[in-house]
């Protein structure tokens, strides 16, 4: 899902949905937009290579977009276990912050907030429409943005997963 958010390309998501729809009906999945820990990029890079997408630069793009490093990015996440050599890292952040509610809210951009809220609701509606058990992690049910106070606690400061555990 977050690949689709960052790239605005639904082809990988469509492929995954097609594969899942062919599985036996007695399979049950837990469906969620984010995890209590972090989001990893276990994407189908063999498929993506058909479109000229290479794993390391693509992971860097996803991480840069979803941490707000691109000027047109609305997302505000943080990396966990960043390994620049491999271009791999895990992503942390609440769904609201990754959808832009945090950025546009702090900027006082009501039009942006409205768009980000629609984005958040759309992603949750998509997740809820999937076969399986929907899981909504702490704070996402109320649109909670990232909590940066973990950085004030020396015991937690080095672990960005506390960003969305608040």
Predicted regions and their residues:
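Active-site and adjacent substrate-binding regions of carbohydrate-active enzymes
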Residues: 1-166
């Amino acid at each position: 899902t977050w690949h689709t958010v960052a790239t605005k390309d639904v082809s990988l998501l469509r492929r995954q949905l097609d594969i899942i729809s062919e599985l036996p009906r007695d399979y049950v999945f837990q469906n969620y937009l984010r995890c209590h820990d972090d989001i990893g990029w276990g994407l189908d890079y063999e498929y993506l290579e058909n479109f000229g997408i290479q794993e390391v630069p693509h992971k860097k793009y996803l991480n840069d977009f979803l941490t707000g490093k691109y000027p047109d990015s609305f997302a505000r996440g943080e990396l966990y276990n960043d390994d620049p050599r491999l271009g791999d890292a895990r992503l942390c952040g609440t769904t609201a912050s990754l959808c832009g509610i945090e950025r546009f809210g702090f900027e006082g951009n009501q039009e942006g907030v409205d768009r980000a809220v629609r984005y958040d609701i759309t992603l949750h509606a998509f997740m809820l429409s999937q076969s399986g058990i929907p899981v909504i992690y702490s704070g996402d049910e109320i649109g909670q943005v990232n909590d940066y106070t973990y950085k004030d606690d020396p015991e937690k400061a080095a672990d960005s997963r506390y960003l969305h555990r608040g």
